Design a protein with these regions (language model features):
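Lectin-like carbohydrate-binding module/patch detector with strong preference for beta-trefoil
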Residues: 2-501
Length: 501
């Protein structure tokens, strides 16, 4: 029943996954916060159900350690007892992954020290089975943000939607724009690959509108990297001169391995003249374009020490403050002159503060200079998060999603996410739409429902690399309230909920 696939060449990696492990009774492996107790009775993937999957390359390319949210290692002692109280990993903390040979692709975890498989008896963990049965099979639930970029280990290139929008190609040197963003949808224990144009990947490389059973792939772990296997037990890889993503081989080599990387925010800015900021005409940063292309798309890279941002161009150069106070895109990363502070304004606009303390403003020619004072209309820009055509929102309580299949009201404590479609409008406004084709609307009590035929305007305010605020057109922030309530509340930005996206 079991099939262990090995790579042709071992891959050394320091990559660590954050996962949940779901047993046959649909319960999660759980590390309790008291007494370092461990069981299998978690109903949803929350903090206590998170495990860091650490590769152990020296013990084999499918060997891992499991570290709890408390920083303790899951281990099996000489008597077969399962523990999770050691801060340092010993020989009993290594497990070898084998993958079931059926389409489900579930994992069995064999303790290398004992030689037995980890299983669940009722809600208790045991390690006594010489061969894996139903109680020893685990479904892997990735706990990372579901929206990612995908990098091929063999090709050393990123996946992107083709120009015709009908296939995925793996030949991008850098992940630039919305076409390199993919959503991994967890469905029935497996994963579907959802593209930015709202299509699903089939094993033959075609993209279709609905998620058919053949669009589901099981997930495998190989030395910190990912492999995706279809229902016919063949693996996704880039094929041919166009590097089209499809399945072909029934074994794993470097060609079948991928890494999942967080998608860094990429934005466009519109000046007071209604033109997009661009580097199309050279190193001068100028607000003079009518449409968004790669030249008008800028990657925002967070500097944690200062709370400011580096602004990167498609040419791998950075905005910098010149001695003339002009802004040019000709610098390498690292200089303090390349850092800009984003300040969000009550009217939905944003100002950029340069290293000289002045606001960046656009001249009549469109050229950007950092010599403006607060209140100058030329220093206000409208912001668009261009590489997020869809959003998945999460807070400490859970994901944002509908209360139930028959209820349009949104809550923020859901165990699974719902994709939010983003429609960009003028002056930084965006409209948010659900999978039911209805728009988000705000009721008199501030609650949010997906039931409106008319679009309601929202502003996106980027606060951190993976966190944002959502503000209504009248200035109210969408906040997580107690008991999972999702409401438009106070206008004070310091009280606004930071949504992981």
């Amino acid at each position: 029943m079991m099939n262990g696939n090995g790579c042709g060449e071992a891959v050394t990696s320091s990559l660590t996954w954050s996962v949940g492990l779901l047993n046959g009774a649909h319960k999660y492996l759980t590390a309790e916060t008291f007494g370092f107790k461990v069981n299998a009775n978690g109903a949803a993937l929350k903090k206590k159900q998170l495990w860091s999957l650490e590769p152990c390359v020296d013990a084999g390319e499918e060997a891992v350690r499991l570290r709890s949210h408390l920083g303790r290692y899951l281990a099996v002692d000489q008597f077969g007892n399962v523990t999770c109280d050691a801060e340092e990993h010993g020989p009993g903390a290594i497990f070898q992954i084998t993958v079931s040979a059926d389409a489900k692709g579930q994992w069995a975890l064999r303790n290398t020290n004992r030689g037995y498989f980890l299983g669940a008896s009722s809600d208790q963990l045991v390690c006594v089975a010489k061969a894996p049965g139903p109680s020893e099979l685990w479904t892997v639930h990735l706990a990372a943000r579901p929206q990612v970029t995908i990098r091929s280990i063999g090709r050393r290139r990123y996946a992107h939607l083709s120009a015709t929008g009908d296939e995925i190609q793996v030949d991008a040197a850098t992940p630039w724009g919305e076409d390199t963003l993919f959503t991994l949808e967890f469905r029935d224990g497996r994963y579907a690959l959802h593209t930015a144009n709202d299509r699903y990947l089939c094993p033959d490389g075609k993209l279709i509108e609905n998620c058919a059973p053949e669009c589901l792939f099981s997930l495998e772990f190989h030395s910190g990297y990912l492999a995706l296997r279809d229902i016919n037990l063949r693996y996704l890889s880039p094929i041919g001169s166009k590097a089209v993503m499809r399945t072909r081989s029934n074994s794993v080599t470097r060609d079948e391995l991928f890494s999942l990387e967080d998608s860094v925010p990429q934005a466009a800015f519109v000046g007071f003249n209604g033109k997009y900021v661009s580097v199309k005409q050279g190193v001068d940063v100028t607000a003079n374009q009518d449409e968004v292309s790669d030249h008008e798309t800028f990657q925002l890279e967070w500097d944690k020490d200062t709370g400011r941002w580096f602004v990167r161009t498609m040419q791998d150069k950075y905005w910098t403050l010149e001695s003339s106070s002009g802004i040019q895109a000709n610098a390498d990363k690292g200089s303090a002159n390349c850092l800009f502070e984003l300040n969000w304004q009550p009217d939905g606009s944003v100002t950029l503060v340069a290293s000289n303390g002045k606001l960046v403003g656009a001249k009549k020619s469109g050229h950007l200079f950092a010599n403006s004072e607060p209140g100058d209309p030329a220093a206000k820009f409208h912001f668009a998060l261009v590489n997020r055509p869809v959003l998945v929102l999460r807070c400490d309580q859970g994901f944002v999603g509908r209360k139930g299949p028959s209820s349009p009201r949104l809550e923020c404590n859901r165990a699974s996410y719902e994709v939010v479609h983003v429609e960009r409008a003028d002056r930084g406004v965006c409209h948010l739409k659900g999978n039911n084709g209805k728009y988000w609307g705000i009721a008199e009590d501030g609650s949010v429902s997906v039931d409106s035929d008319d679009s309601c305007g929202f502003y996106v305010e980027l606060r951190e690399p993976s966190r944002l605020c959502l503000k209504t057109a009248d200035g109210s922030y969408l906040n997580a309230d107690k008991n999972g309530a999702f409401k438009a509340g106070a206008a004070d930005p310091s009280q606004a909920t930071l949504w992981e996206y």
